[in-house]
Amino acid sequence: MLDILLLRKDLDSAVARLETRKKPQAFLNVEAFQSLEAERKSLQTRTEELQSKRNQLSKQIGMLMGKGEKDAAEAAKAEVGSLKTELDQSATRLEQIQGELQTMLLAVPNLPHDSVPVGADESGNVEARRWGTPKTFDFEVKDHVDVGQPLGLDFDMGVKLSGSRFTVMKGPIARLHRALAQFMIDLQTDSHGYTECYVPYAVNADSLKGTGQLPKFEGDLFAAKKGGQDGEPVPDNAALYLIPTAEVPLTNFVRDVVVAEDQLPIKLTAHSPCFRSEAGSYGRDTRGMIRQHQFDKVEMVQIVHPEKSYEALEEMTGHAEAVLQKLGLPYRVMSLCTGDMGFGAAKTYDLEVWLPAQNTYREISSVSNCEAFQARRLQARFKNAQGKNELVHTLNGSGLAVGRTLVAVLENYQNADGSVTIPEALRPYMGGQTLLKA
């Protein structure tokens, strides 16, 4: 959530920056904001006047009583009672206005950092660097579906059990998928200093509100009503949501917490399934594992000092890149433009891995600095050197999406006979195997 003081101080500048993002007209109703702010200011001024008058009358009552002027004192008491009624009405309306402003701000995305390229959509993204050279094959390249099905990828069973965009893995490919996740989590903990966490896969609305998925993106989530306890009926609003990413529970570790400055940075990682409705993705990537309702991901989260967050962004991007480098998968790093960034991000890098069957790079990781946007919703703070509470900055990134990494391994390491060479980094997790074959 944006700092309302920033909007009060320089609304025009904030709106200009918001207008560089996707669908700017949906972000902030400037006229409604200004109207509420004008009413708030007027009410606050009137409230202060009433409080001052009440205080003066209260002093007068004591003086009048001391002088024995009982009738005048009673008249002053009556006026204080009248002022209290008006003060109560003002306080009620002020609370309503604050609630309306809060609701309005919950729908407003983060402001892009000055270094973010301006663009309307993904065509405006800028390549920062690339690593590795795509392999040249001397046979017809198959996509991951054709490579993976003989090895245990079962899309028909996924449809039978759950519907479209679900996949079943069996045998050697299931083991390779597990090996990838284990390799990633070991790399992030052993080499990069993250603390491994096991998190709930269902969270409450407050958690999703804190990280920015609610209330604006409820349609992207899977909701499940909580079961009643001891035969009690279930309230309509007693919902849990399946996590769209482990970023949600990990970042919420610091909700309503004040940490000591010397505890920063806090570096957390988790391997979890992720659940997404993929609303708005009808007809896109319908073949294979690229876009699924359920997929595994190793997530990285850092909670840092505000002055260190852009340094942390570069570090985290490097941590995601390390996975691809150790697997020998060619990739490029893209700096997302203003029109392609996620709702809560101030700056984002996407890692895109080379997929030979598509002859292109596809997203496999996003790493974002949210600055204080999530922390303000979460009230996640640290005590600074002056002893004052200050909002932390939060960052999150994929390290990596396991399913898409499996896709990249199958396509980049395929052989003419249908087998798949297992990358060296994964062989310790595969019992020393060098080949995956049916």
Swiss-Prot record:
GO cellular component annotations of the record: cytoplasm
Location of this chain's protein in the cell: Cytoplasm
Residues that bind L-serine: T245, A246, E247, E299, S398
Domain of life: Bacteria
List of residues binding ATP: R276, S277, E278, E363, I364, S365, S366
Known EC number: 6.1.1.11
Any Gene Ontology biological process: seryl-tRNA aminoacylation
SUPFAM superfamilies (alphabetical): Class II aaRS and biotin synthetases, tRNA-binding arm
Molecular function in Gene Ontology: ATP binding; serine-tRNA ligase activity
Pathway: Aminoacyl-tRNA biosynthesis; selenocysteinyl-tRNA(Sec) biosynthesis; L-seryl-tRNA(Sec) from L-serine and tRNA(Sec): step 1/1
Protein keywords: Aminoacyl-tRNA synthetase, ATP-binding, Cytoplasm, Ligase, Nucleotide-binding, Protein biosynthesis
Cross-referenced Gene3D superfamilies: Bira Bifunctional Protein, Domain 2, Serine-tRNA synthetase, tRNA binding domain
Family, similarity comment: Belongs to the class-II aminoacyl-tRNA synthetase family. Type-1 seryl-tRNA synthetase subfamily.
Subunit comment: Homodimer. The tRNA molecule binds across the dimer.
Domain notes: Consists of two distinct domains, a catalytic core and a N-terminal extension that is involved in tRNA binding.
Task of the protein: Catalyzes the attachment of serine to tRNA(Ser). Is also able to aminoacylate tRNA(Sec) with serine, to form the misacylated tRNA L-seryl-tRNA(Sec), which will be further converted into selenocysteinyl-tRNA(Sec).
Name the UniProt record assigns to this protein: Serine--tRNA ligase
Species for this entry: Delftia acidovorans (strain DSM 14801 / SPH-1)
